[in-house]
Design a protein with these regions (language model features):
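Pepsin-like aspartyl protease folds
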Residues: 529-569, 580, 597-613
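Canonical tetratricopeptide repeat
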Residues: 65, 97-100, 104, 138, ...
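Helix-start (N-cap) detector for alpha-helical repeat units in TPR-like alpha-solenoids
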Residues: 25-27, 60-61, 94-100, 133-134, ...
């Protein structure tokens, strides 16, 4: 919601609200407030509009914009208060602004999860401006989320009657048909959308969903690729991964064909990497990601390579690519989080703790950071420190069952039985969804219900053995069934589990640690792993640091550097006699909007006088 106030405004009101009618306000503060909104400056707009309502408390128009601004800032209470005043004070004859006020309040009520009031407000807005198609679309969305497809379709058909060339009516009816698995009806709607707007990616991505429903994967892949080629459609990206599960060879090969068609485009090899990584074909994914990275030095691609190497157990390469991601975008703390995890997987827990400290300094409210640091501290022998971090995680993420389990295990080790049992009860209370059980089997065993624990782990293995073999090895080791534990550990290693440092210090496996079968098994797969890692000789260096010479010309005390932005022949001019290197607000705004600067690049702002004053 925070990206652009002006976009939010356009989504809520007709362009006719901008028209200057004789009976609409034209006071100084009101006018400046509207200009600030158009320039996407929320703080300045609030300042002027608050002054306006102090001077003119009956200006309902100002309240309507204040409601919009508070909505943009996610200050829903103040947004609702302002919207309530706006609906009362805007002249009833000014239908456009009456509609705007109700539509804004409807959006606020949706954010407050009061769909009944939101529905009433959208209906009031429609009564004021019955030809505004966006209002029907917004109300139809509420019906859709309530599975009231007939009522939603009525609003979508109204959109079509108002504007036959607007794709949203047909898209809505098609989406509703998909939700009801009426695939052929949906396809007919999306076919027409594509005829109306052949470059509208959603027509293809939603039709792909219909084809997947009919198991016509060949057509689905074609539509996904078309949608991705238009604008990198998010739904198409999600469906591509779904197709990787249902029709991997077909999806992978068609992406390869697209790569051959557009050899200079970085996205296609990236997508190949995604589908291969999803299928745990990590080396193929790495090769594809590297191809993409060679065309576009993107931190996300380097991050994905790091993840693949981490899953392969090649921690040196994983760290190298994670460092590359950090060097390309030091503002994304997810890369720091991942680096800490890789360090811990490599057995370097103390370094992992230091790295996670950096992450938590930047994200002090992120519960997952405390959970992982607690995990690292446990591995390094700091039980009390681990309990402290798990407790902080529980404070921030009280529904996360694993935190209670790990803390309960540590309390149990310390002999604090009552506290341990309380935590195990919390695990069972939270980890209850049958198809999504994560750790309740451990809690049941610790609480004395072995049969329930075995039943749960067997169900998990039946559903997805590869993801649960290691858990089974841990559970059976805890229960003292050594042969079963070693057998499941073998299955985990055979299906790609390579976290040897974790295996060697996981206390759950202590009961099999001295067994010959365990020792032989680890020796066998560590040797196999060394061969796997050495076979990838291309990774001695993941990236190379170079120094480039930038030509410039000097004119007096000024230096000019030639550059081009969006094809425009420009110069950056630096005054070498100045203590500050600065950009004007116009230049900075231009560069932010075009992706050359982010908010974190701006240190501050300052007013300067030119020589002319």
């Amino acid at each position: 919601m925070r990206s652009n106030i002006f976009v939010l405004l356009l989504a809520l009101c007709s362009t006719s609200v901008w028209a200057q009618k004789s009976n609409r306000p034209d006071s100084y503060n009101y006018t400046r407030g509207i200009e600030a909104i158009q320039n996407n400056n929320a703080d300045e707009a609030l300042e002027y509009l608050n002054k306006e309502i102090q001077e003119h408390p009956d200006n309902g128009y100002a309240y309507s914009y204040l409601s919009l601004l508070r909505l943009y800032r996610e200050e829903y209470g103040q947004a609702l208060t302002a919207a309530n005043v706006a609906t009362k004070k805007i002249p009833s004859k000014d239908k456009e602004y009456v509609s705007f006020a109700y539509a804004t309040r409807a959006k606020v009520n949706l954010c407050l999860e009061d769909t009944l009031k939101a529905f009433k407000d959208y209906t009031a807005a429609i009564n004021a401006t019955p030809d505004d198609t966006r209002l029907y679309e917004a109300r139809a969305q509420i019906y859709y989320e309530q599975s009231k497809y007939d009522l939603a379709n009525a609003d979508y058909r109204k959109i079509i009657s108002l504007d036959e060339g607007d794709v949203m009516g047909y898209m809505g009816i098609g989406r509703n048909a998909n939700a009801q698995k009426r695939w052929d009806e949906a396809i007919s709607q999306f076919d027409y959308v594509i005829k109306l707007a052949s470059e509208y990616s959603s027509g293809y991505s939603f039709r792909a969903e219909s084809y997947i429903g009919k198991k016509q994967y060949d057509k689905a892949v074609d539509d996904v690729i078309t949608a991705l080629s238009i604008d990198g459609d998010n739904k198409a990206f999600y469906l591509m991964q779904q197709l990787a599960d249902s029709a991997f060879v077909l999806t992978n090969n068609k992406l390869k064909v697209q790569t051959a068609k557009e050899p200079n485009e970085s996205s296609w090899p990236y997508f190949i990497g995604v589908v291969n990584e999803r299928q745990n074909k990590y080396q193929y994914a790495i090769d594809a990601y590297k191809n993409s990275l060679s065309k576009d030095n993107n931190p996300i691609t380097a991050y994905r390579i790091a993840n693949c190497y981490d899953d392969l157990g090649n921690y040196e390469s994983a760290l190298a690519y994670c460092e590359q991601a950090i060097s390309l975008d030091s503002t994304d703390t997810d890369y720091i989080f991942q680096k800490a995890n890789i360090l811990n997987n490599a057995g370097r827990s103390k370094e992992a703790i230091e790295c996670m400290n950096i992450y938590l300094e930047k994200n002090p409210e992120e519960g997952s950071g405390y959970y992982r640091r607690g995990w690292f501290k446990d591995h390094s022998g700091d039980i009390d420190g681990a309990i402290e971090d798990y407790t902080m995680c529980i404070t921030l993420m009280p529904e996360y069952a694993y935190c209670y389990l790990n803390r309960g295990v540590l309390y149990r080790l310390k002999g604090e039985t009552k506290l341990a049992e309380e935590d195990f009860h919390q695990v069972i209370e939270r980890d209850t969804i049958a198809d999504e059980i994560e750790c309740a089997h451990y809690a049941y065993y610790y609480m004395g219900n072995k049969d329930k624990a075995v039943s749960l782990i067997n169900n998990l293995i039946e559903k997805d053995g590869k993801s649960n073999y290691y858990d089974a090895a841990c559970l059976y080791s805890i229960m003292g069934e050594k042969e079963k534990s070693i057998g499941y550990l073998r299955k985990a290693l055979e299906t790609g589990f390579r976290r040897f440092a974790h295996i060697k210090r996981d206390r759950d496996l202590n009961n099999i640690r001295n067994e010959k079968g365990y020792t032989d098994l680890l020796n066998e797969f560590e040797e196999k792993h060394r061969q796997e890692v050495s076979s990838d000789s291309s990774d001695s260096e993941s990236f190379e640091e170079t120094t480039e010479e930038i030509p410039f010309s000097k004119e007096g005390d000024m230096c000019k550097v030639k550059c081009a932005i969006n094809g425009l022949p420009l110069h950056f001019i630096f005054d070498t006699g100045s203590s500050n290197v600065s950009l004007s607000s116009v230049e900075a705004t231009f560069m932010v909007k075009n992706g050359y600067l982010s908010a974190s690049d701006v240190v501050g702002k300052q007013h300067f006088l030119t020589a002319s004053g």
